[in-house]
Amino acid sequence: MDIAQLLAADGVVLRSGASSKRQALHTVADTAARALGLNENRVLESLLEREALGSTGLGSGVAVPHARVEGLERVVAVFVRLDTPVAYDAVDDRPVDLILSLIHI
């Protein structure tokens, strides 16, 4: 499967002013909610629950937060590029500026 097939319509943010991990995840949730007609708080809560299990910061400035939103049956991706890297508890302790989020809907 091509990643372009996973990207939600309007699921790309090339310039986010988020200045913290939580704000970055809020941007992901907002983008997914608007693109897919979902409740933003529901998406954000799912992302935060998953992050509480362990950081999804892969290193080299990349994070792959993911979540399952109950009742939905496909996987969609949201891409966010931050203007300024943020602390993310990544495995290499480097800040993150590229976020590819997978939402199972």
Give the predicted meaning of each segment.
Residues 1-103:
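Cytosolic covalent-transfer regions centered on His/Cys nucleophiles
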